[in-house]
C-alpha cells in the first residue's frame, strides 16, 4: 500500500532529515512528498477533465498505448522526464504534516472514486505530451507515477545515510 509505505518512510524523521538534499539539484524527502501530493491532485484533475466530456467510442483508435505500456513507461526510471512547473514542490502545504494529510485525503477520495464509479472510463480521453490516453489509463498513470516518484526520490537510500 503506497500510503502506508509513505507514512512509514517519513515517520519520526527530523526536520533536518526531511529537508536534506543529497545534491543541490536533487529534491529532499519533504519536496518529494509534496510532489507526490501535488501530483495525486493534479493527475486526478486530468481525469475529472476527461469525465466532463461525453463518452465517445469513435475516438478509441486515438489511444495508441496499452495499459501495460503506460505502466512500463511511467515506472521506467531510465526514461528521464522534467517535472512540469505545476507539479514542482513550492511549500504550498506549509509543513510535512499538512503535505502528508493532503496526500492521504486525496488518495482516499481517489480510491473511493475507483471503487464506486460507474463512469465509462474507456471512452473518455485526455491528451498528454506522449499521446492520447483514456480515463482508465489516467488512473494507471497516477498510480504508477506515485511509485516512480518514491523511487526517484530515493527515500530509503537517504534515510539509511542520514538517520
For the regions a language model picked out, list residue spans one by one.
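Start-of-domain marker
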Residues: 1-26
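Alpha-helical packing segments of well-folded alpha/beta enzyme cores
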Residues: 2, 6, 39, 43, ...
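Short, well-ordered helical secondary-structure segments
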Residues: 5, 14, 74, 120, ...
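Acidic/histidine-rich alpha-helical segments that form the ligand environment
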Residues: 9, 68-121
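Short, conserved sequence motifs enriched in acidic/basic residues, glycine, and aromatics
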Residues: 12, 26, 93-94, 132
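Short, contiguous alpha-helical
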Residues: 20-70, 115-163
Amino acid at each position: 500500500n503506497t500510503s502506508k509505505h509513505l507514512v512509514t518512510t517519513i515517520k519520526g524523521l527530523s526536520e533536518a532529515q526531511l529537508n536534506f538534499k543529497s545534491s543541490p539539484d536533487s529534491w529532499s524527502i519533504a519536496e518529494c512528498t509534496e510532489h507526490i501530493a501535488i501530483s495525486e491532485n493534479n493527475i486526478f484533475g486530468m481525469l475529472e477533465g476527461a469525465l466532463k466530456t461525453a463518452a465517445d467510442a469513435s475516438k478509441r483508435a486515438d489511444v495508441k498505448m496499452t495499459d501495460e505500456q503506460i505502466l512500463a513507461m511511467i515506472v521506467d526510471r531510465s526514461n528521464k522526464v522534467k517535472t512540469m512547473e505545476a507539479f514542482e514542490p513550492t511549500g504550498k502545504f506549509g509543513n510535512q504534516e499538512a503535505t502528508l494529510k493532503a496526500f492521504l485525503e486525496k488518495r482516499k477520495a481517489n480510491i473511493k472514486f475507483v471503487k464506486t464509479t460507474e463512469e465509462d472510463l474507456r471512452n473518455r480521453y485526455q491528451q498528454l505530451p506522449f499521446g492520447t490516453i483514456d480515463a482508465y489509463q489516467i488512473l494507471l498513470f497516477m498510480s504508477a507515477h506515485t511509485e516512480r516518484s518514491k523511487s526517484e526520490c530515493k527515500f530509503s537510500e537517504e534515510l539509511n545515510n542520514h538517520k
